[in-house]
């Protein structure tokens, strides 16, 4: 993430022979690797030769710059004018709308507020009044008296980010404003550090929300079983190694975050997000694990059927059936790999997408085709690579990773699973599911 990592941290990653999934994501976010995980030597050389205690910044055009920390421990932000006088952060001062506004302007939200509101108005016109939605006055809204309304001003006063987004859209809607409990604040004093931290927390939380929706399929729930947060969310966005999902829920909303219409995140262009976050969202879109399996599998030995030594109608028929099955499996793998850089095609397979294929066991059948395309040696080599690279998500899925039998030998149950049979799945059907002809 721009402005978060020290050169020394990245240099340590670059010195490793094998990087973890989280470390690879960091290198991609900084432009040191391509989305296909290929190194960018010129930028790596820049980092290798930079001062170890410098902070790495990524400009909008992707170029790198390095800022050495000042003696006070603060770093100069790109574009900050020397000698510019600002309200000092970390002190208390008598409340005034003007000073609050000054602090807010220095810490604005990283996402375009107008675009958020436009998308919400277009795609979420009617929040359903069911047991699964917001109750009256469930969303707590705080705002400073006399301060112009914006999502950033709501954040500064302690409103949570998802609540601020909803309020910005539905505050004037008689159909929806029943869900808000609005409190106008006019304190005697303002803690400038707390105000700024509120906005920064909102910024981090909205970035995490995008990652969770795109990468895990939705937002966490306060009432559901605790689910793990990715290393990217914990360490790259929040810089909190032990951050839990229930803690993130508190940062996101005063209500249950799972009630928020998460599909709206798929409608907001990722170009409005910081590069490192948009890159992370595009890296691992929920609903596309078969594509990630295919990208890995293509590196290993493919299966081939030897021509039978004894030719007769029975052996010839069996040979042709097996050959056609393997050839179709290979073509399916090729199609999946060809879509690996097609972001829009992958979004169609997201669990929240209305365009997602309704075919039963579709992902399971794709996985079976991927495993079928490999020789037994190829499957074992892929299994070994999954272990060496510590791809935990793949290890948890025995359909791609396999399992050990009673003799300790790797087997792949997906190949004998009737639900995984892809004989009725055509290559054209796979293309159509991803919006391709």
UniProtKB/Swiss-Prot annotation:
Location in the cell: Virion; Host cytoplasm
Keyword DNA damage: no
UniProtKB keywords: Capsid protein, Helical capsid protein, Host cytoplasm, Ribonucleoprotein, RNA-binding, Viral nucleoprotein, Virion
Principal localisation: virion
InterPro entries assigned: Nucleocap_ssRNA
Gene Ontology CC terms, in alphabetical order: helical viral capsid; host cell cytoplasm; ribonucleoprotein complex; viral nucleocapsid
GO molecular function, one term: RNA binding
Family named by the database record: Belongs to the ophiovirus nucleocapsid family.
Assembly and binders: Homomultimerizes to form the nucleocapsid. Binds to viral genomic RNA.
Function recorded in the entry: Encapsidates the genome, protecting it from nucleases. The encapsidated genomic RNA is termed the nucleocapsid (NC) and serves as template for viral transcription and replication.
UniProt protein name: Nucleoprotein
Taxonomy of the source species: Viruses, Riboviria, Orthornavirae, Negarnaviricota, Haploviricotina
Record gene name: N
